[in-house]
């Protein structure tokens, strides 16, 4: 969550792990379509693209988070994002662009790259919150003797990435997801999209 233009983001490793998990849950047809239609062999290769270009496109910073009114627990678009310039609404927007074969190739390809990243962002709980604690940035605690923010820990500070193989870690995490959970994520639409919705969106093409 951000304030006055300040934006926190999942670390590169976290985004790539999420992208690997997403790819493990794509149908063979959807995976083939991504390769042939968009020339993207691995979703992890484009997982941090939106963070890279955000440095130059400051107007896109609000796309990486959604602020929900303090005291509320459910996202309401009319109240929380009336201009549609937030993470939740951008996921919806780019999902439609990816599925629209009448849209220019470069726009659809960029939309897919945004989607891979933003679905990762929305799975970081502190990207959906209120401004009061700046997405956990103002909550300080000690971890391994270091004074760090709660947001830092969520972004990857709890994992020693130097000791982790990203593909193996993603495979391990994916193995812990029940088939019933995947089905629920796929068919039970929530205010934000789950990883499985990428597959569902592509199936409409």
What are these regions (language model features)?
Residues 8-118, 125-205:
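N-terminal, motif-rich segments that launch catalysis or mediate targeting to/interaction with membranes
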């Amino acid at each position: 969550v951000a304030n006055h233009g300040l934006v926190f983001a999942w670390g590169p490793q976290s985004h790539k792990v999420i992208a690997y998990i997403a790819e493990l849950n794509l149908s063979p047809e959807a995976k083939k379509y991504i390769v042939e239609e968009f020339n993207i062999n691995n979703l992890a290769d484009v997982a941090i693209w939106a963070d890279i270009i955000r440095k130059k496109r400051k107007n896109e910073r609000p796309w990486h988070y959604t602020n929900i009114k303090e005291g509320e627990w459910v996202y309401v678009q009319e109240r929380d994002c009336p201009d549609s310039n937030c993470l939740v609404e951008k996921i919806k927007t780019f999902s439609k662009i990816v599925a629209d074969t009448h849209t220019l190739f470069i726009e659809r390809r960029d939309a897919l790259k945004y989607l891979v990243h933003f679905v990762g962002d929305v799975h970081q709980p502190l990207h959906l919150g209120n401004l009061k604690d700046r997405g956990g940035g103002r909550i300080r605690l000690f971890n391994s003797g270091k004074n760090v923010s709660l947001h830092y820990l969520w972004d990857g500070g709890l994992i020693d990435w130097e000791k982790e193989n990203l593909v193996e870690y993603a495979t391990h995490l994916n193995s812990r997801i029940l088939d019933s959970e995947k089905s629920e994520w796929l068919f039970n639409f929530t205010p934000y999209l789950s990883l499985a919705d990428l597959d569902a969106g592509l199936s409409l093409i």
